[in-house]
């Protein structure tokens, strides 16, 4: 089969790269520049990567041609990936049902509870004088706050994280182990039981409310939603916690500025998400022939939209490789764009604002461990630091 763009002499040149060789692990700025410099469309590992701002944004806003369902709903999998793997109008219905629970107004009611958990988690670390911030905080923090909002027992946090880690590791292995399969089965059994229990005995939590509203989700839809949120819905905050603490450890003047002017924490958080989004690309599949970057992709072409490359493309003063702290919140695509823009973006901002503010309150001065060199796990579907050793007196 001929790859589009390479069918005959003199045709459009399609650059080919190997994803795992991109220099992403140490410096995403260099990694995304390598991809942008290769061309507007780059073929890697069976996917067409779109690297130009105008092409990426046009695709994000056009689900009719760039389908999420075809890219994200595994063939033959009876569990619907709600709401991610749906296109309008089905996706529109899911957003309408779910959006009220993740709106600023709804989250403001949960703020006192979320703040208490944030204070307690950092208080448990502050007296140690050191921590490995990814394992001790970043991986735990969004899960704990999610359980509070969603309505799952807090005592199940660690085993849910264990199941999640095993299932994600399984997806990266050519041959799953028996332990991987067992973890996937146990997670599904757990969620099935919790969904059924909340349907029988609903409470004020999100898991209950989406099953009893004016347009309730079916049991299989709620199960698919819960499965997605556990496996992939919390990565943005985990990654951003790590990158936030990394930058603060490096920059004592920035720490002092944010302590003196907490309103600027919001600007800082937006910059972290712009520079280091955990989900740097959005997968899509074309539903009809479409011309992008000078070449025509046929229907059924697997595409990845490089939002992280756009965020750093230098097209304006705010789209650089540097942390821009000018007092303003600037537009970026770290939370995606178009109808599939991150449903939990308001929650992520709230959680990160709470965490950075409370960390600086309890641990105002800290530093990186000697000889530490930050790297992300790469290649990986989600970008986050491998580890982050911090210390303070």
From Swiss-Prot:
It comes from the Bacteria. PROSITE patterns: CYTOCHROME_P450. GO terms for molecular function: heme binding; iron ion binding; monooxygenase activity; oxidoreductase activity, acting on paired donors, with incorporation or reduction of molecular oxygen. Keywords: Acetylation, Heme, Iron, Metal-binding, Monooxygenase, Oxidoreductase. It is an enzyme of class 1 (oxidoreductase). It holds the Pfam family p450. Cytochrome P450 that accepts electrons from the iron-sulfur ferredoxin FdxE encoded by an adjacent gene. Belongs to the cytochrome P450 family. Interacts with the ferredoxin FdxE with high affinity (Kd=84 nM). This is Cytochrome P450 143. It comes from Mycobacterium tuberculosis (strain ATCC 25618 / H37Rv). The gene is cyp143.
